[in-house]
Amino acid sequence: MKQAPARIGYLGPIGTFTQQALVGEPDLQSAEHLPFRTVADVLDAVQSGDVDLGFVPIENSIEGTVNYTQDALVFDYNLLIQREVVIDIELCLLVRPGTKLAQIDEIHSMPVATAQCHGFLRSNLPTADIRITNSTAEAAKIVSESTGLNTAAVAPRNAADVYGLDVIAENIADQEGNQTRFVLVGKENIPAPTGNDRTAIVVFQRADEPGSLLAILQEFAARRINLSQLLSRPTKRGGLGNYCFIMYADGHISDELVADALRDLHAKQGDVKFMGSYPAAVKHAQNTREHADARWREADDWVSELRSQIAR
């Protein structure tokens, strides 16, 4: 993406990890960054054209998929992922100046963040009430506006500077190596291939029967396409047991083998939603993809040569 779009909506308010990840993208820094209260608000703004692109969290290395983002992209919006961004996450406990740990009986944050710090909170603040917010920065803002010295927020360190809070405990996540993946989404356009890309699709099964998932996976295995992520989510229709499969595959739709796999899936399964081909944040095994593509082209040429010999 050579030129930054005019307006990018992101999960706000100011001070979220989402904003931190967004401003870390050099080619997007000159765009107008507009905070929204919820992920749905961001995606609504993209769908309506109020902003050009949206930037939202979609996966955490400790807690897994951010389901409300994933489900919204699968079921509620027709948007395309333009890129992904992965950043390291350090969660801190933020308080109003003068607050002591023993005084805290109310903790604000979003569910994904408090879940990542469950062990710390259980050991140090076992009786504190957990109050749900839409973002970690919103939690910090709420604490900054409180009048007592009994509230705290699980939030980024930079939110302390934004909202005038103190860091009473740092790096409180239960596991090391905490990272979050964010995606940039838009209404149209598939980015050009970079040689290190991912393709996201959703497959709705034509029939729930033995071997149905295996048949889907074989389309990728037969072409030596690596699936970096496979998720099953309820389709939200037809009661229990109705699931779709969200798949993230290494490669770009411009790759012959990826395109061929999607073509076969569409023909055999019928209901396949394309969610984008875009630059991957993590380097994958490119040599395997290049060799597989070369073998596919050679095989295609061989079949074409044989077919050219058919009597007219």
Question: What name fits each language-model region?
Answer:
Residues 1-312:
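Domain-level signature for soluble enzymes in the chorismate/prephenate branch of the shikimate pathway
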